[in-house]
């Protein structure tokens, strides 16, 4: 056994864990970030003194610097599951940097904030010690090894170690010194650690390991000064810290010339008799997101500015909670959460998910008895507890941390019980969270009794209702992961929040996850399986972010902003009822602005100041209640902060009677021939193909609009959330699917009567019996208008359809369009709370969404009118759905990356009866029945007009 394979000794000469701080005054801080000498060895056992050094920037991940290929894997270990042993041929990166010391009068410490996975430290050729725990701080005292003058620090980083079995998180697997590395020079008699606790009854208690001077400040105002190892401060009329009111006091500790500052938030955490989460005595709703450290082009490395920007963006989406999946973040990230107001569920660097797959043909069940897991193995107890201790000690003084999480997807065993025992011995306030103790894959009775929160992943809406109605648990219930945001989505976050607001015990959850993990190669986002060195991979499952890897937003991002909005409203019969969904903040200083729109006009607009208290509602009466419209009516409501920021805009359609458009009903001239029916007018000429059951030519003002015949279709390029059902829709194998991606229209007969053409048809996937028996009826009028009627039945027993509608493939020149529908972003029947019904202008380029794996996008629901380039218009008396794309469904379906789509050769217009919803089934539950296109009888009418 090599030294780094012993789970009972995962460090040597590492300092005891302590709270994070950077001392000032007599202490000196020296960042070692920057250029280091570097040598990469494919086999650490054969490493020699480098004859030639490369240069590498620290922090960085060596896979992104040309040493090894990146590797993305979710559950499977990238090596044999044979704990505690790792591959005999174990790569190593050797880092070296020189520093110059002018004096040795102080104590010197080398601190590594993050290094993967095992690091051995040498100073001037002398061994100092080693550490494991990639995302955990490691501190080494190096005073003895240093000398006055030039010194050489060497850090040997091993790719794998025993700790790798505890770090099987869903992410690209990187190595190197990926967080800050720095030196501290401190007085020889200095404070090592301190602890700050607060009570919402005004107290701040500071405990240190020295008899120190301790000062308490409110901003720059000194409130009180005391001396001692334990000092208690009472703050008069304190401003309490919450995610909505992130007010911070400052504690300054002075000892032997050193100055240590710590920002402090006064708050307490409890659970109510109703099993609500209470912050400062008030019930709090968790509106969260899971946050991995991942950065566009940099892997696990994030600068201070990038971390701050993430917190700002997350806060801007009305999120109030981050789960640090699945390890502690950089400590500065937590400081930003304190500052901006984000609750944190701080997770230990712990996941052993791969043990589910250590034997073939095993279902998704944590069988902790058949095989020894790290969680049940006594040899691993010390390392489990050590990782929890290091997590707690570093971040114990951060106000934002409201829960400690033991880790992720590791099963429950006695070693986790020991971790909980440790936490309970040092922290009596914060809650203990561990999804594996109460998982849908198996609940541990011991684990359930020890944790403070029942946490699950991706429980269905029905499952949550069942738990709440049957009172299954006597603890707060949350989803640490829900609404899987992969690709086009998520589509169900609004529905989950409906239940949060209904059931006090359901305290909320954290969306999976914040940002896509990708590696950019020649401008193209790459993912698992794209790199030759990957021995196992999980494809594009890493592209599951609420934002793209560069932090740009998608429709799902805006949907979450709306679902998490701190208000909701309902409009009915002139009554506008507004509900404040803040936990602590009244609307007194906020502005509520509403607009009532009818067609293309705003008929009423007003700004209001309403003193709505948290979780309370107030109704106002509007002057206008639209009764008639040509296209549609709606009411939009903005909530504007005192600083002028629009926190969210929500919209609600208003039901009103449609004013029917006057139509020219003069029949067009029709000529019926053997295989074609011709229609001609002053500025148009159409040809209906009897063999195809639809038009194959539409000439308007001398220009042929069609690039291909019009056709009925039911397939869509699968979104990531279709990944578990695509085999039932498409030809993925020989036996399961309806094969809708290779569909045939069989025309049984065509009847021409005056200006009416009726085609009786079937739609079938290749090798399959008809899935849809239907009739297309078109009526052609003298002004060029075509009235379409679709009337048909879906085969009994057939699966629900992804969509159903007509495809009009137009010439490529037809790029611009104007529409009255839900916009401006793409939207679907379940993901439509981020849009409003209005007139919008767009084009094919604007509609395209650059998902890392190309997929269905660009649908607009609740449509009444679509006009392409002032040439052709689609209208309907009842709402329809449409999509305008520069790419065909086939192009999007076959491409695995954006550079594989090919060139745009046409403008593809879909006029759809309906599309099934988005959901979050890429990892979450099946799409809710109400959002499935499961109707068996279909009737759909729309007009095609000359614009």
Language-model region placement:
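Extended substrate-binding grooves/exosites of carbohydrate-active enzymes
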Residues: 1-24, 58, 65, 73, ...
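Accessory beta-strand-rich segments of carbohydrate-active enzymes
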Residues: 1-18, 22-23, 37-43, 65, ...
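An acidic-aromatic loop/edge-strand motif
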Residues: 61-64, 69, 76-85, 132-134, ...
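Beta-strand/loop-rich accessory regions of lumenal/periplasmic or secreted enzymes
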Residues: 64-66, 159, 242, 628-631, ...
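Short strand-edge motifs at loop-to-beta-strand transitions and within beta-strands
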Residues: 95-97, 136-140, 229-233, 616-622, ...
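Beta-strand-rich binding/interaction modules
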Residues: 121-123, 202-226, 251, 575-610, ...
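Extended acidic/polar, glycine-enriched regions
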Residues: 144-150, 207-273, 628-665, 672
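Catalytic cores of secreted or luminal carbohydrate-active enzymes
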Residues: 167-190, 513, 517, 524-571, ...
């Amino acid at each position: 056994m090599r030294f780094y394979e012993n789970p009972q000794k995962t460090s040597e000469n590492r300092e005891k864990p302590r709270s994070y701080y950077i001392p000032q005054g007599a202490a000196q801080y020296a960042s070692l970030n920057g250029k280091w000498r570097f040598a990469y060895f494919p086999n650490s056992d054969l490493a020699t003194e480098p004859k030639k050094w490369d240069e590498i920037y620290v922090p960085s991940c060596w896979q992104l610097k040309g040493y090894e290929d990146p590797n993305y894997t979710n559950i499977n270990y990238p090596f044999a599951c044979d704990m505690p042993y790792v591959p005999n041929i174990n790569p190593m990166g050797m880092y070296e940097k020189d520093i110059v010391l002018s004096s040795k009068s102080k104590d010197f410490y080398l601190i590594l904030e993050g290094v993967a996975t095992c690091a051995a430290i040498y100073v001037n050729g002398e061994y100092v010690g080693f550490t494991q725990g990639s995302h955990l701080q490691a501190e080494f005292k190096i005073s003895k090894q240093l000398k006055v003058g030039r010194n050489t620090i060497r850090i040997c980083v091993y790719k794998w170690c025993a700790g790798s079995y505890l770090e099987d998180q869903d992410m690209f697997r990187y190595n190197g010194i990926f967080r800050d590395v720095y030196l501290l020079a401190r007085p020889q008699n200095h404070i090592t650690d301190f602890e700050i606790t607060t009570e919402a009854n005004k107290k701040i208690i500071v405990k240190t390991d020295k008899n120190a001077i301790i000062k308490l400040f409110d901003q720059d105002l000194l409130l009180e000064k005391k001396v001692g190892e334990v000092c208690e401060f009472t703050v008069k009329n304190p401003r309490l810290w919450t995610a909505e009111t992130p007010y911070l006091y400052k504690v300054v500790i002075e000892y032997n010339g050193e100055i240590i500052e710590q920002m402090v938030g006064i708050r307490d955490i409890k659970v109510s008799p109703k099993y609500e989460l209470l912050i400062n005595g008030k019930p709090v709703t968790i509106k969260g997101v899971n946050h991995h450290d991942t950065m566009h082009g940099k892997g696990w490395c994030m600068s201070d500015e990038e971390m701050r920007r993430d917190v700002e963006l997350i806060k801007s989406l009305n999120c109030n909670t981050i789960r640090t999946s699945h390890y502690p973040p950089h400590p500065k990230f937590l400081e930003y959460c304190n500052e901006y107001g984000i609750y944190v569920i701080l997770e230990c660097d712990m996941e052993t998910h791969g043990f589910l797959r250590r034997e073939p043909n095993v279902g998704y069940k944590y069988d902790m008895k058949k095989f020894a897991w790290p969680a049940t193995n006594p040899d691993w107890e010390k390392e489990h507890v050590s990782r929890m201790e290091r997590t707690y000690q570093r971040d114990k003084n951060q106000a934002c941390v409201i829960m400690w999480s033991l880790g992720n997807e590791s099963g429950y065993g006695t070693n986790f019980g020991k971790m909980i025992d440790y936490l309970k011995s040092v922290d009596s306030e914060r809650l203990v969270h561990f999804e594996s103790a109460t998982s849908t894959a198996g609940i541990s009775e011991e684990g359930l009794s020890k944790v403070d929160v029942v946490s699950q992943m991706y429980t269905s809406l029905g499952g949550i209702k069942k738990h709440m109605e049957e009172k299954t648990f006597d603890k707060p219930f949350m989803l640490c992961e829900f609404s899987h945001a992969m690709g086009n989505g998520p589509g169900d976050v609004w529905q989950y929040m409906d239940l949060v607001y209904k059931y006090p015990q359901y305290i909320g959850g954290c969306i999976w996850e914040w940002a896509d993990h990708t590696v950019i190669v020649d401008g193209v986002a790459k993912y698992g399986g794209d790199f030759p060195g990957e021995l196992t991979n999980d494809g594009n499952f890493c592209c599951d972010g609420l934002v793209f890897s560069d932090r740009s937003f998608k429709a799902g991002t805006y949907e979450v902003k709306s679902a998490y909005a701190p208000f909701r409203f309902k409009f009915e019969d002139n009554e506008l009822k507004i509900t404040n969904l803040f936990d602590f903040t009244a609307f007194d200083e906020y502005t509520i602005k509403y607009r009532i729109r009818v067609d293309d006009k705003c008929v009423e607009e007003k700004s209001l100041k309403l003193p709505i208290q948290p979780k309370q509602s107030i109704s106002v009466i509007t002057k206008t209640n639209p009764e008639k419209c040509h296209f549609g009516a709606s009411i939009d409501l903005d909530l504007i902060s005192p600083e002028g920021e629009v926190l969210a805009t929500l919209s609600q359609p208003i039901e009103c009677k449609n004013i029917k458009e006057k139509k020219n009903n003069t029949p067009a001239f029709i000529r019926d021939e053997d295989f074609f029916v011709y229609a001609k007018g002053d500025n148009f000429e159409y040809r209906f193909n009897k063999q195809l059951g639809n038009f194959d030519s539409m000439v308007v003002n001398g220009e042929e609009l069609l690039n291909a015949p019009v056709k009925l279709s039911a397939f869509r390029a699968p979104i990531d959330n279709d990944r578990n059902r695509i085999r039932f829709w498409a030809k993925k194998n020989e036996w399961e699917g309806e094969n809708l991606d290779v569909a045939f229209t069989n025309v049984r007969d065509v009847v021409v009567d005056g200006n009416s053409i009726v085609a009786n048809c079937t739609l079938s996937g290749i090798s399959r019996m008809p899935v849809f028996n239907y009739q297309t009826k078109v009526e052609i009028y003298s002004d060029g208008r075509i009235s379409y009627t679709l009337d048909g039945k879906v085969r009994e027993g057939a699966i629900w359809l992804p969509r159903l509608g007509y495809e009009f493939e137009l010439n490529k020149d037809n790029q611009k369009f104007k529409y009255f529908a839900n916009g401006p972003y793409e939207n679907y029947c379940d993901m439509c709370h981020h849009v409003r019904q209005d007139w919008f202008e767009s084009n094919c380029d604007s509609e395209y969404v650059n998902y890392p794996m190309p997929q269905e996008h660009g649908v607009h629901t609740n449509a009444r009118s679509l006009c392409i380039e002032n040439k052709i218009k689609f209208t309907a008396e009842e709402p329809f759905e449409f999509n305008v794309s520069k790419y065909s469904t086939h192009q999007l379906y076959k491409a695995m990356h954006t550079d594989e789509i090919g060139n745009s050769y046409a403008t593809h217009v879909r006029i759809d009866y309906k599309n099934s919803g988005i959901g979050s089934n890429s990892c979450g539950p099946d799409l809710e029945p109400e959002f499935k296109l499961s109707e068996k009888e279909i009737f759909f009418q729309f007009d095609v007009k000359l614009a």
